A protein has these predicted regions:
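Generic detector of solvent-exposed, compositionally biased contiguous segments
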Residues: 53, 61-62, 115-125, 152
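Active-site-proximal alpha-helical scaffold in enzymes
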Residues: 111-138, 176
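Short, conserved acidic/polar surface loops in the N-terminal third of protein domains
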Residues: 94-99, 119-121, 146-151
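Conserved "HGTGT" condensation-loop signature of ketosynthase/thiolase-family condensing enzymes
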Residues: 1-108, 166-168, 172-179
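A generic local secondary-structure boundary/capping motif
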Residues: 9-12, 124-127, 159-165
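Acidic, glycine-rich active-site loops and adjacent beta-strand->loop/helix elements
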Residues: 87-92, 114, 139-145
């Protein structure tokens, strides 16, 4: 019986031999800064709009800042990144897609809501293990733009219970590499 379970697990498990987590970068909004992990973030926003006209533009700038920060921390040049895998909570991964316009790396947009980061890490690891040298995995959201799409637009003025869920304003990214 034990060998059947082991055989079954081997068929459903992906093993990575040549993938290493090299560096990470975490960007957070003002509300997250006030939390227990506030001093652990690499970069925090002073205001929700990040000096932009709209929350969506602020979210795009959050992605750009996090990706630039990751490259600086890892001492990698943009040309050394083979692919960026990631997404956000907006339709068509609009914030991530616009942030990637300036990048020389290939971009694979992912939309898996709260699972986007895990999905990007799994796909990134598979690509680095077999084909590529460096992959950036990224996911993020902005409370105000996600609220507009998923719950109640802030402009509607709906009162919130203190126990209501609160979407994070933040971006997390990691560099996966063969080295």
């Amino acid at each position: 019986m034990g060998t059947n379970i082991e055989t079954s697990l081997k068929k459903r498990t992906i093993y990575f031999d040549r993938v290493f987590w090299q560096e990470g970068f975490a960007l957070a909004g003002p509300k997250e800064l006030k939390g227990k992990l506030g001093d652990k973030f690499d970069f925090t926003l002073i205001n929700d709009k990040f000096d932009q006209d709209t929350f969506e533009k602020a979210e795009r700038k959050m992605f750009e800042t996090a990706l630039d920060g990751l490259l600086a921390k890892s001492k990698k040049l943009p040309i050394e990144i083979d692919v960026v895998l990631g997404g956000d909570l907006l339709n068509q991964c609009v914030s991530t897609s616009f942030a990637m316009r300036k990048s020389s790396a290939s971009f694979l947009g992912l939309y898996n809501a709260c699972g986007t980061y895990a999905e990007s890490m799994i796909l990134g690891a598979a690509l680095v293990d077999k084909f590529l040298d460096n992959a950036v995995c990224v996911s993020g959201s902005h409370f105000s733009s996600a609220e507009r799409q998923y719950r109640y637009p802030l402009e509607l003025g709906v009162l919130r219970s203190p126990m209501t869920q609160w979407t994070c304003s933040g971006v997390g990214c990691s560099l996966l590499s063969r080295e």
